[in-house]
Amino acid sequence: MMQTGLDFTLVEDLVAGVDEVGRGPLCGAVVTAAVILDPTRPILGLNDSKKLTEARREKLYVEIQEKALCWFIARAEVEEIDQLNILHATMLAMQRAVEGLSITPRLALIDGNRCPQLSVPSAPVVKGDSKVPAIAAASILAKVSRDREMAAFELIYPGYGIGGHKGYPTPVHLEALARLGPTPIHRRSFAPVRAAHEARATIMMGGSISPSVGLLQD
């Protein structure tokens, strides 16, 4: 299927696009990216990362880094998500992405309906990753970066299927969580993780099960 991209002539000088990946998963960091595209160096096929194949995202990931005026990938860790909540952690990670840019944008366009506190003017754009090329580019950088990290965690924490579901609460993930217990990269503030942790702790206290290598440590 032909994957058409956004109109690159929409790119404006020194406007950063900002997006996040990983608000919904039960494990791993929330990853953000900020990108300022170069209007003189077109990138064909930019679109919401979720609308692209993995192979296309990987190619665009390299091309964006080569052709953009500047870009920065940031994150908020699991501990920050649990401490702040996922919304505030996402805003913090977006703030870090914009602050990490080597060029100060005159405007930051944020995917979604709210903006983090920034030192530059900003505006939210609902479904911006399918409207604004710079936001689409940011969504690609964030998604490829996070997906690669999840693939690495698959090797560190086998049995959970993390490389496949990327941490999202699929039946496979929920079953593994109940069977194996949470890992150190699971978000304890998320209800399914907390429930699995408490259930497993209760069973262990009863002496009927030995600790799993994946079990969260207090």
From Swiss-Prot:
Disulfide bonds: none annotated. Its cofactor is Mn(2+); Mg(2+). One of its GO terms (molecular function) is manganese ion binding. Residues 13-202 form the RNase H type-2 domain. GO terms for biological process: DNA replication, removal of RNA primer; mismatch repair. Transmembrane segments: none annotated. A divalent metal cation binds at residues 19-20, 111. Coiled coil: none annotated. It is found in: Cytoplasm. Pfam families: RNase_HII. It catalyses: Endonucleolytic cleavage to 5'-phosphomonoester. Endonuclease that specifically degrades the RNA of RNA-DNA hybrids. Belongs to the RNase HII family. This is Ribonuclease HII. It comes from Pseudomonas syringae pv. syringae (strain B728a). The gene is rnhB.
